[in-house]
Swiss-Prot record:
GO CC field: extracellular region
Name of protein: Toxin BmKK12
Disulfide bonds: 4-20, 10-25, 14-27
Keyword Disulfide bond applies: yes
Domain notes from UniProt: Has the structural arrangement of an alpha-helix connected to a beta-sheet by disulfide bonds (CSalpha/beta).
GO MF annotation, one: potassium channel regulator activity
Physiological role: Blocker of potassium channels (Kv).
Modified residues (Proline amide): 31
Tissues in which the UniProt entry reports expression: Expressed by the venom gland.
Residues the record lists as Pyrrolidone carboxylic acid modifications: 1
Broad class of the protein's primary localization: secreted
Length: 31
């Protein structure tokens, strides 16, 4: 579960986070 409060929290899960929504990180597809 990729939890976040804002998109900055997503950098620990994603190289290029797309958004934080409903407490979950969404990542851009990796190259």
């Amino acid at each position: 579960q990729r939890q976040c409060q804002n998109v900055q929290n997503c950098y620990k899960y994603c190289m290029s986070p797309k958004k934080c929504e409903y407490g979950t990180c969404y990542c851009e597809p990796s190259p």
